Amino acid sequence: MAIIISVTNFEKEVMQSKIPVLVDFWAEWCGPCRMLTPVIDELAKEYAGKVKVCKLNVDELSDVASRFGVMSIPTVIVFKEGKVVNQVVGAVPKEKLAGIIDDLLAE
């Protein structure tokens, strides 16, 4: 299960993480975001312990979304050591996100 990001845990869960973090920026009203939800949940299970998978509701944390330039949702941003290393906009196939994670883990 993906970690739900809040104003109180963003720094700890994402910016200070010792392992890479995939963050799904989404909203309840966003149809493509809902399509991506099962993909995000599968990635969380498959990469447990290797990559942290998180969900951030842009309606609740619009300041964080703005901080990272999120203009469209869903947007998936991958962080490593507190820095953005990849970003994908739109409801993309699981294989694309898995490929990004695999490439990152191979570094």
Enumerate the predicted regions with their spans.
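Proteins that catalyze or organize thiol-disulfide redox chemistry
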Residues: 1-52, 60-107
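Conserved residues in the N-terminal Rossmann fold of short-chain dehydrogenase/reductase
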Residues: 55
